[in-house]
Amino acid sequence: PSGYAVREAGPPAYYRPNSDNRRQGGRERLASTSDKGSMAVESAKETRYCAVCNDYASGYHYGVWSCEGCKAFFKRSIQGHNDYMCPATNQCTIDKNRRKSCQACRLRKCY
């Protein structure tokens, strides 16, 4: 690409509420567990995932939720004007464990 595109701000591409699927305000909520009646603290933080590799997102960078690794990769890619070539079929799987295996496909997922 000749430049870079910034995605429109809006609902996050990869938003997943915490595991119990209940939105909680900015506070922790106490809930009793059904077994033994003990109290447990549920986290109020909503988990967001990187739109590129699906790792945990560190923040909203360049218009999408992304991890620190993909944020830095995208920044280096647009500043260095790199021309990456996919050694396979331009359809490599980019996830947390394989995000470093193909820079061309990783950059393509950034756009």
Swiss-Prot record:
GO MF entries: nuclear estrogen receptor activity; sequence-specific DNA binding; steroid binding; zinc ion binding
Post-translational modification: Ubiquitinated; regulated by LATS1 via DCAF1 it leads to ESR1 proteasomal degradation. Deubiquitinated by OTUB1. Ubiquitinated by STUB1/CHIP; in the CA1 hippocampal region following loss of endogenous circulating estradiol (17-beta-estradiol/E2). Ubiquitinated by UBR5, leading to its degradation: UBR5 specifically recognizes and binds ligand-bound ESR1 when it is not associated with coactivators (NCOAs). In presence of NCOAs, the UBR5-degron is not accessible, preventing its ubiquitination and degradation.
Family stated for the protein in its record: Belongs to the nuclear hormone receptor family. NR3 subfamily.
Ranges for region Disordered: 1-42
Zinc finger (NR C4-type): 50-70, 86-110
Domain notes: Composed of three domains: a modulating N-terminal domain, a DNA-binding domain and a C-terminal ligand-binding domain. The modulating domain, also known as A/B or AF-1 domain has a ligand-independent transactivation function. The C-terminus contains a ligand-dependent transactivation domain, also known as E/F or AF-2 domain which overlaps with the ligand binding domain. AF-1 and AF-2 activate transcription independently and synergistically and act in a promoter- and cell-specific manner.
Gene Ontology CC: Golgi apparatus; nucleus; plasma membrane
Region (Modulating): 1-49
Keyword annotations: Activator, Cell membrane, Cytoplasm, DNA-binding, Golgi apparatus, Lipid-binding, Lipoprotein, Membrane, Metal-binding, Nucleus, Palmitate, Phosphoprotein, Receptor, Steroid-binding, Transcription, Transcription regulation, Ubl conjugation, Zinc, Zinc-finger
Subunit structure: Binds DNA as a homodimer. Can form a heterodimer with ESR2. Interacts with coactivator NCOA5. Interacts with PELP1, the interaction is enhanced by 17-beta-estradiol; the interaction increases ESR1 transcriptional activity. Interacts with NCOA7; the interaction is ligand-inducible. Interacts with AKAP13, CUEDC2, HEXIM1, KDM5A, MAP1S, SMARD1, and UBE1C. Interacts with MUC1; the interaction is stimulated by 7 beta-estradiol (E2) and enhances ESR1-mediated transcription. Interacts with DNTTIP2, and UIMC1. Interacts with KMT2D/MLL2. Interacts with ATAD2; the interaction is enhanced by estradiol.
Its job: Nuclear hormone receptor. The steroid hormones and their receptors are involved in the regulation of eukaryotic gene expression and affect cellular proliferation and differentiation in target tissues. Ligand-dependent nuclear transactivation involves either direct homodimer binding to a palindromic estrogen response element (ERE) sequence or association with other DNA-binding transcription factors, such as AP-1/c-Jun, c-Fos, ATF-2, Sp1 and Sp3, to mediate ERE-independent signaling.
Matches recorded under InterPro entries: Estr_rcpt_N (IPR046944), Nuclear_hormone_rcpt_NR3 (IPR050200), Znf_hrmn_rcpt (IPR001628), Znf_NHR/GATA (IPR013088)
SMART domains reported for this sequence: ZnF_C4
SUPFAM superfamilies in UniProt: Glucocorticoid receptor-like (DNA-binding domain)
One GO term of the biological process aspect: phospholipase C-activating G protein-coupled receptor signaling pathway
Designated name of the protein: Estrogen receptor
UniProt biased composition (Basic and acidic residues): 19-30
Compartment(s) where it occurs, according to its Swiss-Prot or TrEMBL record: Nucleus; Cytoplasm; Golgi apparatus; Cell membrane
DNA-binding region boundaries: 50-111
Modified residues (Phosphoserine): S32
